[in-house]
Amino acid sequence: MQMAIIEFARNKLNIKKATSSEFGKGGTPIIGLISEWNKNGKMIKGTDKDLGGTMRLGLYDAKLKENSLVKKIYKSKIIQERHRHRYEVNINYKQQFEENGMIFSGLSPDNKLPEIIEL
């Protein structure tokens, strides 16, 4: 999903240097540690050694969007899927993605973390 989001940002949002901070420095991190972008939408960069407590691991709830393909498939409003990663989609770009055709069809219960996308 993260690579699809990076490619979408490059080709549909025209963010040519869209990347993940997981790949190193430089570019525009569309994907990153939550601690890098969660302060009022502004980029905050900690050190690479400052990773304690940043991994989401195990089953996580995802609220499914009404009339989405994933909701039709699962036939449920909420599902649980296994998750093991510390890098997340920067939700500050959500509106731009949606205006260009991406559907965030599964979000964390607090609506801050995309779990499922549809193109």
Regions found by a protein language model. Name each.
Residues 1-9:
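Catalytic nucleophile loop
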